[in-house]
């Protein structure tokens, strides 16, 4: 068996796994920004039906902060999620089980940090995440 792709789920899909009802049309994934890992991520996306992922070169993916793949669903591959780097996100990630598949998901703290963009929707998300953190009695 080959190596597994290294990633952490971010964005609204991560918020949903934490228990919010935030709607979204995309999947935000923070990846370990190495060429080898980007190859594994692109291969995994291709295997799951996102054939457009096969058209991207791993070198291209790691050379920029975000790569958008596909349309429905749209997958946004991040090499940095605003101020959050992969190593710190991976170290603090919480794994959720989604239909038998373990999904490494950004901590509430890292979700909040990734939402400090100044956009109105992100400001609203921060309020929801801070309330969720309070309800779960998380630091």
What is the predicted role of each segment?
Residues 1-139:
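Compositionally biased terminal segments of proteins
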């Amino acid at each position: 068996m080959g190596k597994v792709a290294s990633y952490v789920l971010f964005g609204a899909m991560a918020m949903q796994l934490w228990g919010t009802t935030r709607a979204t049309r995309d999947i935000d994934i923070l990846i370990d920004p190495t060429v080898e890992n980007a190859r594994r991520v692109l291969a995994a996306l291709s295997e799951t039906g996102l054939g457009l992922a096969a058209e991207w070169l791993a070198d291209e993916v790691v050379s920029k902060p975000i790569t958008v793949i596909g349309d429905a669903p749209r997958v946004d591959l991040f090499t940095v999620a605003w101020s959050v780097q992969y190593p710190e996100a991976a170290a603090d990630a919480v794994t959720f089980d989604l239909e038998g598949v373990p999904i490494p998901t950004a901590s509430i703290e890292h979700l909040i940090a990734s939402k400090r963009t100044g956009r109105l929707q992100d400001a609203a998300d921060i309020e929801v995440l801070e309330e969720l953190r309070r309800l779960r009695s998380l630091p």
